């Protein structure tokens, strides 16, 4: 085929499909007695791509992993948080079992098991959600609750969350409807006051109201891929009742709300049991006893709490847990940096006192596991900068002093060949 603007007689040419003249299009491709323009070619490609997508089988695990198998996989990547992993494994298993059986079992309608994760920063909330989605091979997206506002106000509309999920699976609606959505910082959209206000709270209670239907289950209308380019296309209809929503937040101060309730319910007077300072419950122990009434007092509206029936609490990670996180998971931080150095042909060794120093530093910063990478990165920055220029470097050793900025990493060099042979 050839690209032609005019035939041999100089006659004006037209596209045989859309009828546009050669002056209205960029290219006109000639075939045996027919012509097709570049716009029609693009349209044909889009049609074929859509048909291939519809005919392609939806990849889904043939067998749903059991709660034990889900928990075991989480153990490979997440240290500690045993109760939270158990709760998540059961909730996720029940959710996908419900989807496979068409929302009903023996005529009984099965409700959604959306999840609320409560735990301090860096305790593993996001990692748990990401690991679950990766293991189950389902689309996953994250949203920050602090950026959301009610429709019509400056900020991100809640239905943008579904748009992000669709983007992750190339706008395959069926695949998106089996996905997992993690909404972080959910504690930041609490009501500003327990008393109703005459002023509109568009980023607090207003967002909770907007999320209600989405989390419970509704048919969301989402603009198709390239919606602005093709405004005539119909909106995609996504059933959110099949999407698993996991909401997470630190809920700073919630432990005090729980403690207040427990103290109120405990006896007072001569017969009351008096607890010493040492017997007082820790923050983690208090959060493990959280009730819906505590969350309402904290600022979540009752209707929203009702849409998150499964509640899992995560404890603050101690020093030993942080040391484990540094070296035990399959994608442990020390293993990642060792693999990075190995690409340069150099071994990297972290001594035990270095791991302890990293954990202590993260504890003092109160950043949990999230702060570990920045500490290691800062300690290795100069070495990683110089390493590609080093000759005969064989090993880099990191100890406590390196982490605390008191000394440089120890670099061990291999002996040059001419020295080794005695020349």
Swiss-Prot record:
GO molecular function, one term: ATP-dependent protein folding chaperone
CDD domains associated with the record: RecA-like_ClpX
Disulfide bonds: none
Domain of life where this protein originates: Bacteria
Subunit structure, as described in the record: Component of the ClpX-ClpP complex. Forms a hexameric ring that, in the presence of ATP, binds to fourteen ClpP subunits assembled into a disk-like structure with a central cavity, resembling the structure of eukaryotic proteasomes.
HAMAP family: ClpX
Family: Belongs to the ClpX chaperone family.
NCBIfam families assigned: clpX, PRK05342.1
Protein name as it appears in the record: ATP-dependent Clp protease ATP-binding subunit ClpX
Species assigned in the record: Proteus mirabilis (strain HI4320)
């Amino acid at each position: 085929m050839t690209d032609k603007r005019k035939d041999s007689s100089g006659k004006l040419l037209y596209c045989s499909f859309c009828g546009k003249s050669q002056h209205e299009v960029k290219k006109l491709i000639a075939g045996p007695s027919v012509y097709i323009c570049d716009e029609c070619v693009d349209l044909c490609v889009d049609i074929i791509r859509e048909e291939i997508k519809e005919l392609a089988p939806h990849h889904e695990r043939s067998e749903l992993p059991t709660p034990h198998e889900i928990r075991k996989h989480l153990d490979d990547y997440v240290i500690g948080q045993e109760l939270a992993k158990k709760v998540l494994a059961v909730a996720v298993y029940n959710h996908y079992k419900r989807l496979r059986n068409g929302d009903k079992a023996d005529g009984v309608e099965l409700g959604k098991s959306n999840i609320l994760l409560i735990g301090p920063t860096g305790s593993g909330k996001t990692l748990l959600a990401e690991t679950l989605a990766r293991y189950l091979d389902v689309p996953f997206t994250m949203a920050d609750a602090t950026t959301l506002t009610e429709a019509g106000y400056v900020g991100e509309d809640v239905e943008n969350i579904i748009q992000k999920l669709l983007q992750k699976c190339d706008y395959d609606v069926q695949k998106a409807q089996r996905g997992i959505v993690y909404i972080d910082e959910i504690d930041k959209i609490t009501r500003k006051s327990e008393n109703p206000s005459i002023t509109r709270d568009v980023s607090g209670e207003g967002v909770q109201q907007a999320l209600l239907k989405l989390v419970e289950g509704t048919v969301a209308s989402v603009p198709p891929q390239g919606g602005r380019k093709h405004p005539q296309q119909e909106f995609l209809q996504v059933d959110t009742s099949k999407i698993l929503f996991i909401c997470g937040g630190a809920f700073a101060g919630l432990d005090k709300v729980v403690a207040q309730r427990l103290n109120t319910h405990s006896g007072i007077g001569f017969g009351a049991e008096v607890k010493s300072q040492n017997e007082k419950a820790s923050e983690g122990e208090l959060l493990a006893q959280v009730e819906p009434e505590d969350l309402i007092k904290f600022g979540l509206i009752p209707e929203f709490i009702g849409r998150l029936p499964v509640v899992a609490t995560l404890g603050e990670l101690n020093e030993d847990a942080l040391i484990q996180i540094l070296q035990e998971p399959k994608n442990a931080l020390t293993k990642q940096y060792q693999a990075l150095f190995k690409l340069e042909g150099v071994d990297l060794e972290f001594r035990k006192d270095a791991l302890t120093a990293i954990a202590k530093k993260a504890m003092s910063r109160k950043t949990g596991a999230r702060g570990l990478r920045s500490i290691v990165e800062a300690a290795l920055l100069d070495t990683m900068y110089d390493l590609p220029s080093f000759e005969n470097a064989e090993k880099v050793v990191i100890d406590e002093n390196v982490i605390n900025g008191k000394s440089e990493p120890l670099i061990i060099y291999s002996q040059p060949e001419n020295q080794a042979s005695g020349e």
